[in-house]
Design a protein with these regions (language model features):
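Substrate-binding/catalytic subdomain of NAD(P)-dependent oxidoreductase enzymes
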Residues: 64-166, 171-173
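Rossmann-fold NAD(P)-binding glycine/threonine-rich loop
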Residues: 1-10
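Catalytic, metal-anchored helix/loop core of enzyme active sites in primary metabolism
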Residues: 38-40, 48-51, 67, 72-79, ...
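Short, ordered loop/turn segments at secondary-structure junctions
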Residues: 1, 16-18, 270-273
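Flexible, glycine/charged-enriched surface loops at secondary-structure junctions
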Residues: 78-81, 102-110, 132-133, 210-223, ...
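Conserved small/polar residues in nucleotide/adenosyl-binding loops
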Residues: 282-286
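Rossmann-like NAD(P)H-binding beta-loop-alpha module
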Residues: 12-74, 85-86
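Cytosolic Rossmann-like ligand/nucleotide-binding regulatory domains
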Residues: 255, 261-280
Length: 286
């Protein structure tokens, strides 16, 4: 972007995030006069296919990844996808455009899906949720009124009543919350030769029109220059799965540890497994 500005040429990259879904253009144009508060996106088709299949079939991660490879949804080396690097790069682009502040992939907190188990998925179901790898880009306002940008990628609990919970397979979606426009969701194929070509062709047409009419595309303005928030300063809810000894007072000891660290427990489930118990704890914001 800096090189393009220096050379006074336009930079087009609609296909860089979510394939055929038009999200870069709306952020640069349609939403330019609004204040975006949050973006939550399913922006990687490989991981969404894997998590959707694990949820639907009950298969474990390794088995589902292998099937994704056979179907062409996963690369021979899927690291960039399953460890969240690809989604983090896209979160950086979305954050930069939405909050008019320079955000790089290194600024994005990142977790992948390789540690997700069927126990995690069952726990999500008990809470009427599903698990999605989300790219979350958020404007954070502190008590003194100062603002910062939080960008993070991690497997998140999505309530089954939320629109993003219905996005399955290799499809992508970007859910946006803005001060004036309210809630908006963009949905469609996030990868594949033809959908991606559609986005690239759209950029070529836009560039050609600007050449013919002597116009310029909207630049990547970072006038707000908001700082990057520390991940530890972001409050959200957590799902904790653990196995504990099945004896009197064990749960009390566990909750005491959370209380000593100022973390309150909203929901607790226990399942007996012989001499041990599976314990599910869902925290309040922490």
């Amino acid at each position: 972007a800096a090189a393009a500005d220096e050379s006074q040429v336009d930079l087009y990259f609609e296909a860089a995030v979510a394939g055929a879904i038009p999200i870069i253009g709306p952020l640069k144009r349609s939403m330019a006069g609004d204040e975006i508060q949050r973006i939550m996106g399913i922006v990687n088709g490989t991981t969404n296919y894997i998590l959707s299949a694990m949820d639907a079939t009950g298969a474990d991660y390794a088995e589902t990844l292998a099937e994704a490879g056979r179907l062409g949804y996963a690369e021979a080396d899927p690291t960039a996808d399953v460890e969240g690097f690809d989604a983090a790069s896209k979160a950086a682009i979305l954050s930069t455009l939405a909050f008019h502040s320079r955000v790089t992939a290194k600024d994005v907190y990142r977790e992948g899906i390789t540690k997700i188990t069927q126990q995690d998925i069952r726990s999500a179901h008990r809470l009427n949720c599903t698990i999605k790898l989300l790219a979350v880009c958020e404007r954070i306002t502190s008590q003194d009124g100062s603002q910062s940008v939080s960008a993070r990628v991690y497997p998140a609990l999505v309530p089954l009543t939320h629109q993003l919970a219905t996005v399955n397979g290799a499809f992508n979606a970007v859910f946006m919350e803005a001060e004036s426009a309210g809630q908006i969701m963009f949905y469609g194929p996030g990868a594949g030769g033809t959908p991606t070509a559609s986005a690239v062709l759209g950029d070529l047409v836009a560039a050609s029109r600007n050449v013919v009419h002597g116009g310029r595309a909207p630049g990547d303005n970072t006038y707000a220059n908001l700082p990057i928030a520390n991940f530890g300063d972001v409050q959200t809810r957590y799902l904790v799965n653990m196995y504990v000894v099945d004896e009197k007072g064990t749960l009390s000891k566990v909750t005491d540890v959370f209380a000593k660290n100022d973390v309150s427990i909203a929901t607790v489930y226990q399942d007996e497994l012989g001499e041990s118990e599976a314990c599910l704890l869902y925290t309040s914001d922490a």
